[in-house]
């Protein structure tokens, strides 16, 4: 590296503060999913109305994503992410004080949902301002890990805490942690180091309109958006309804939390291992085939398993393969839309993936009379099979 460019140790402080708020927003997102049934009884509402707590995040992301990316690009990540962090801290505490008032709890959740795009859409911007090119993938990986750990914590801790705490107190505790992480970010974050970490031209913009337009002219990119829509739709659907999926088979909210956590653990391992193998082999299409094909047995087990061992193993397998598809698809999108910046192509994939909230709603609407999600899970398996056709249209870019 040219000696005029310097890397500062403080970059890890900024990254840690950023990863922490990404962790807390995910815990707030998923906190009701493993206790859907008990929460419905507490608020006196239906399972679907509890599902709105998670769905609100996906609903809010769709209209806010592009304006927030523009804000990050125009005013910098520190201002934009601080806005999101403060929204998260304020509405996290408000949700805790809502008590048994479902309406107030839901509206405060929409406030939390409005905060999420400010955090997710800066994933490439923070590393671009502070890290050298060869460190940025690692930096984004750390934020991704924080995101997944936050989801896993929400899955595991919530049903455990529910055994000794009320739902409002659980939410207030999560809100307090969120407020702490928000204050920490505002105090510690800096927009840029004193001197740049790389040569001019290597910075990444959060959104570039020219890149946006070009991306949509690439046929393979459309198929990438389709498989991302399916993959994230199924992931969000399963995590949102995790407790309802296994409840008819006699499993408890604690079982649901363990199941969700194992799915996330499998996802973390898959998201590290599969993209690394894809990089080593320099093949994207092959590993996308493996990811979607491997997800089908996991989904089948989640649909029909009646023993906890088989159910947990199925969740791990589903998480391993389904989650691993996303980083590979994102890298593929970056390659086929080059020279479009990665922030633009990845942002579009996130946008389409969050738009799959429609599948989350369809899953609940397809429940059978006895409350079983089997019809919806069979649809998910059909969509995974359809993804194999879409992947067949995603040829690797010539090296």
Go through the PLM ranges and name each one.
Residues 108-146:
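Cytoplasmic helix-loop-helix junction between adjacent transmembrane helices
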Residues 104, 142-193:
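Helix-loop-helix hairpin linking two adjacent transmembrane segments in secondary transporters
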Residues 64-76, 270-283:
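Helix-to-loop junctions at the C-terminal end of transmembrane segments
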Residues 63-101:
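Conserved MFS/SLC helix-loop-helix module at the cytosolic interface between two early adjacent transmembrane helices
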Residues 334-370:
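A late C-terminal transmembrane helix in Major Facilitator Superfamily
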Residues 32-33, 218-261, 265-271, 360:
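Extracytoplasmic gate region of multi-pass secondary transporters
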Residues 282-329:
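C-terminal transmembrane helical hairpin of 12-TM major facilitator-type secondary transporters
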Residues 2-8, 192-224:
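Juxtamembrane intracellular "pre-TM" segments in multi-pass secondary transporters
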């Amino acid at each position: 590296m040219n000696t005029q460019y310097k890397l500062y140790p403080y970059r890890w402080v900024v990254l840690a503060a950023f990863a922490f708020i990404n962790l807390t927003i995910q815990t707030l997102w998923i906190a009701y999913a493993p206790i859907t049934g008990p929460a419905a009884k507490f608020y006196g509402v239906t399972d679907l109305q509890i599902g709105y707590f998670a769905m609100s995040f996906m609903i809010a992301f769709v209209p806010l994503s592009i304006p927030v990316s523009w804000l990050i690009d125009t005013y910098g990540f520190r201002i934009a992410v601080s806005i999101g962090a403060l929204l998260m801290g304020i509405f996290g505490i408000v949700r805790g004080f809502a008590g048994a008032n479902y309406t107030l709890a839901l509206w405060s959740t929409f406030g939390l949902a409005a905060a999420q795009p400010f955090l997710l859409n800066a994933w490439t911007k923070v590393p671009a301002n502070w890290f050298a090119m060869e460190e940025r993938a690692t930096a984004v990986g750390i934020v991704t890990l924080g995101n997944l750990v936050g989801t896993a914590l929400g899955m595991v801790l919530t049903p455990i805490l529910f055994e000794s705490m009320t739902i409002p107190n659980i939410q207030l505790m999560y809100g307090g942690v969120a407020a702490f992480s928000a204050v920490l970010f505002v105090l510690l974050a800096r927009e840029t180091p004193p001197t740049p970490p790389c040569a001019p031209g290597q910075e990444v913009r959060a959104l570039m309109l020219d890149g946006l337009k070009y991306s949509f002219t690439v046929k393979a990119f459309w198929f990438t958006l389709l498989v991302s829509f399916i993959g994230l739709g199924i992931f969000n659907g399963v995590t949102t309804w995790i407790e309802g999926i296994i409840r008819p088979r006699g499993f408890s909210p604690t079982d649901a939390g363990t199941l969700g956590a194992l799915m996330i653990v499998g996802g973390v391992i898959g998201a590290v291992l599969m993209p690394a193998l894809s990089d080593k082999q320099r093949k994207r299409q092959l590993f996308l085939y493996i990811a979607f094909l491997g997800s089908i047995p996991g989904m089948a087990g989640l649909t029909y398993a009646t023993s906890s061992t088989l159910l947990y193993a199925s969740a791990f397998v589903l998480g391993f393969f389904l989650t691993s598809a996303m980083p590979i698809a994102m890298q593929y999108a970056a390659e086929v839309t080059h020279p479009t910046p990665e922030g633009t192509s990845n942002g579009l994939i996130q946008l389409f993936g969050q738009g799959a909230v429609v599948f989350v709603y369809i899953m609940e609407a397809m429940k059978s009379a006895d409350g079983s999600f089997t019809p919806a899970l069979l649809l998910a398996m059909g969509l995974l099979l359809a993804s194999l056709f879409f992947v067949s249209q995603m040829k690797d870019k010539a090296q």
